[in-house]
Amino acid sequence: MQKNEIKQSDMKPLIIDSSWTERFLPDPPREKDNRPPFRRDRGRILHSAAFRCLQAKTQIHAIGENDFYRTRLTHSLEVAQIGSSLVAQLKFLETFESLSQTLNIDKNELQKQLKPLLPSNDLIESLCFAHDIGHPPFGHGGETALNYMMAEQGGFEGNAQTFRILTKLEPYTENAGMNLTRRTLLGVVKYPALLDVASPQYAELNFSRNIDPRFVRIHDWIPGKGIFRDDLKMFNWLLENLSENDRTLFGKFKKVRENPAESLHTRFKSLDCSIMELADDIAYGVHDLEDAIVTGVVNPHQWQAAHSALKQIPSAWLQENIDSISQRLFSDKHFERKQAIGALVNFFITNVRWKLTANFDEPLLRYNAELSPEVIVALGVFKKFVWDYVIRNVDTQRIEYKGQRMLTEMFQIFESDPERLLPRNTANRWRNAPEERKKRIICDYIAGMSDAHALRVYQQL
């Protein structure tokens, strides 16, 4: 966005509409329950079965069986801690400097105006606790398997499943999931578009679905990002108080699809979501690297290219510290590695700043958190290293491929005789669902499994 697109005269007074604390179903506090709305949301997520299940979902599949490595549960706890630190950092005057130059408004005035917009600790922790609960067993392999099986019924994607769990599946209410506040749900939605629109248009492609599940190519069935069409009612409710301009702008894609194999990604997210996503990226780039180093998945020789790339970034802190950081990352002394990890996390957190997204009417959409340009590049180096040497590690890929096979075969088995093989409650839901939604019931059941549970069920079958 050009600096002259939004001028000081365009700045609208900061108003946080009370509708953001509304819930889909009336839900008055219990007697003598004086907790604010977002603390109640935090409690519901923390005590949910979907959150507990994260303890049995591995963050990195190639690092072996020991007590050190992170699960998706410990990852989510670390994301919450980083998220709270980012919120605290965004209250300081220096984080408004770039936005002040963009809008030609005094940064003290911006600080006074925008600080009340920041999420509370309860809210940001709610988002960070919830952000991974829709991810299926066996990582990308599991996601691909379910997307392959659901390609003709709207597809499957982990973020979409998170929204579905929060708004429908988690049995806090009969049909509205956890019945969370509107602002909490807005903060969880990373991609505000329908998945079947954002995903590759499989009907126009020549990908065969009549093949042995052992030979499904993962790259042919990587899903897009969005919300299931089955959950459109709750998505519409979430956005119903936005202006028509905001709803249209919020769902815009970054580009126009040029061929049917392309996935589309939306351009915008809420302020709260941008903070949560930064926290997730920092945890992924730094803490997952720590796991890989400790367990021997990566070595100093492999790190050299990343080290050289970081040396080229015009950051005074990196120029001064990256040699020492790299040495301590691979030190035999655990405390030195922990100090290096802590220094990196602090570097990313303290370089967060406010940014203007677009001329939204809603302040929660008008502003986001971001890292400064050189720090974005640095985080990208860390994320790429984890992707290249950890996620794409052959051991990781073999485990995910095995999971992909298991989930695809389980889906086919359940679909062949669901009333016999599905658990009673799931079978009842399948029986009562309209024909076009029966496969979604099977998908929900499999997606909710942990890695170990999926393996046990597969062995039983």
UniProtKB/Swiss-Prot annotation:
Keywords of this entry: Hydrolase
Ranges where the record places region Disordered: 22-41
HD domain segment(s): 72-285
Disulphides: none
GO molecular function, one term: dGTPase activity
Top-rank taxon, per record: Bacteria
InterPro entries in the record: dGTPase (IPR006261), dGTPase-like (IPR050135), dNTPase_2 (IPR023023), HD/PDEase_dom (IPR003607), HD_domain (IPR006674), PHydrolase_assoc_dom (IPR026875)
Record GO biological process: dGTP catabolic process
Ranges of Basic and acidic residues composition bias in the record: 24-41
Pfam families the record matches: HD (PF01966), HD_assoc (PF13286)
Membrane-spanning residues: none
Family listed: Belongs to the dGTPase family. Type 2 subfamily.
Protein name: Deoxyguanosinetriphosphate triphosphohydrolase-like protein
The organism of origin for this protein: Haemophilus influenzae (strain PittEE)
